[in-house]
C-alpha cells in the first residue's frame, strides 16, 4: 500500500490541488514560499504520528487567506492494498476490488470550538475503530541544531530508542538494571563528613542523618536524560557531540529515526516526511542521505508478511531546495511547487484590499521595468501595479514531472544532464538555454559590461537567470520540460533559447586538413609546427592563398545560390522550437533567437577581429598564419574557415580568456543576436 495522491481544497496556499506521489520516494522541489511545507503539513494533519502525540492541529488560519469558504478539506488516496490491508481498511475502500482506499479530513471554522471531521471511503462515512490508525507518519523537521536535540536534558530521541529495544521487558525493569551504584567509598566519605556536622547541628533537638546518592525511584526517562551520544570518525574514540560538526550530528539524528522505523511494525504504512535533509551537509553527504532514504523504503517492502499481519511499509516524502538532491533522483519522482498570482473571485474583488506582500512586489517590479520612464509615467505605473495586486492572490500550483509529455529517451537525457551538471534547471523562473559552455560563460560578462551596463535592475534580474548549456542543439526535451502546463502552471516563467545559425557549416563532419591537424598535434606536444618560416616570404604566400580563396569563394557562391537550401539550420531549428512552444501553449513565455553563423564567426562579423585574434593566438601561438588566412576571407568562406580552425580549439578556455579581456576593458562589440537574447530574458 502507498499514498498515491493527496488532494487539497482551500488549505493554506492551495485552492484546488492534487499532488501525485510515487510508491517509495517522492521529492518536493521548488522555490521558497512555494507551498512544499504546507503539503507536508497536510499529510501530518490527515495521518496519525507514529508516536501518537500530535505536534500540529487544525486551526482557522489553515483556511486559505481571504477565501469566501470557511472550511478546508484534505483527502488522501491509497492504492495497492494487500489482502490483509483490504480487511483492515474495508470501511475506507473506494472500489469493488478493495485495492484502493481513501481518508478525508474536513475542517470548518464557521462555529466556535470547531473540530475536524474524519471520513473514510467517501465523505460522511465514519471509519471503523482502528482503521485510520493503520496509516502513520514520522516527521523529521529541518535540523538546524541536531546536537541540541540529542543533548542532555532532551530525552525524547534516546527514550524512544530505549523503548523500542525493550524486547518484552518493562521500562521499570530496564531502569532498575541501569540504576547507578551508591556504594562507592567516595560517597561514603562524603556521607560521614556531612553527617558529623549535621549531628552537631541537630542532636539537641531531633538528630538527622544524610546520605548522598542517586534518586531511588529513578525512572527510565530520567536515565535517558543523562545518556549522551558520542560521535567521531571511524577508528577514533567517540567524543562528546559538541566537538562534532552540525552535518554529522544531523546524520546521527536521522539514523536514530531510521532505527525506530525499522523496529516498528505497528502500522501498515508509515509516511516518513523529511524537510530539507540537505541542511549542513556537503553534496556527497546529501547523496548519501537520499540513497539511504530510498533504501529504507525499498527494504520495508522487501519481505511482505504472508500471514496478513501489519506490513510495516515505508513511503518517503522529501522537501528540498537542493539542486543536488533533485538531480540524484529520476525526474518522475519530482514534484515541482510553484507560487503563482491568481485573480481574486468576483465576490471578493470589490472589497479586497491589496495584500501588503503583493503590493510591495508590484511596486518593485514596476520600478524595475520603468528605469527610463518619466516621473509621471512611473507614478502611474506604480498605481496601476498596486491596483493589479489588489485583484490578485498567490496560489500554489504543483507540477508532477511524471505527467510531462516526455518519452523515455527524453527523460533519460534530462536525467543524465541534471545528474552530471546539478543545474538549477527546476528552480529558475527565467531560463536561458544555450548550445555550449562558451555561451554560458560569455553572456553574463557581456550583459554586465555592455548590454545591461546602464540598467542595474535588469542586470540583477539577468544574473538570477538559470543558464543551461546543453552541449548540443537538441533543445526540444528541455522546452517540453520547462513549458508544458500542468495545473495551470509551468516550470519556466520565461524561456529563451539561443542557437547558432550555422550557415556555411556542413552538417556532416568536415574533412580535416592533414597539415593543420599535424600542426595542432605538434603544438600540443610542444614541438615546432610544420616547417614554414615566419618571414616576408610567408606573407607573400598568405596573400597568394587569400587571392585564390577569394576566387574560389566567388565561384562557389554562384553554385551555392542555386543548390543550397535558403533556410539555414538555425532558422529551421528556430521554427521547430516556436512550433513546439505554440503546441504547448507557452509561446508567450518563449523566445528562440538565432544567428547567421556560429558564435565565433558572429563575434568576428560584429567587429571583434583584434580581441579574438589575441585570444586565439594565446591558445595557439604558432597558428598566426592560419588565423590571418581565415579572417582575410569574407562571407560564407570565412565562416567555413573560422569553423574549421575552431574545431581544434578548447571552447571553454577560449570563452574564459575572452571573458577576461572583456572584463579588463578591451574594445568589444556585442553581436546583435547575443544582445537580443540578453534583452529577451529580462523583457
Task: Report each predicted region and the residues it spans.
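Switch/communication elements of ASCE P-loop NTPase nucleotide-binding domains
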Residues: 1-48, 230-421, 663-675, 679-683
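Conserved helicase/translocase motor-coupling segment
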Residues: 422, 427-509
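Terminal low-complexity/disordered tails
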Residues: 608, 615-618, 627-683
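Electropositive, glycine-dotted interaction segments
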Residues: 82-173
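Flexible phosphate/Mg2+-sensing switch loops adjacent to catalytic phosphate-binding sites
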Residues: 48-71, 267, 299-312, 338, ...
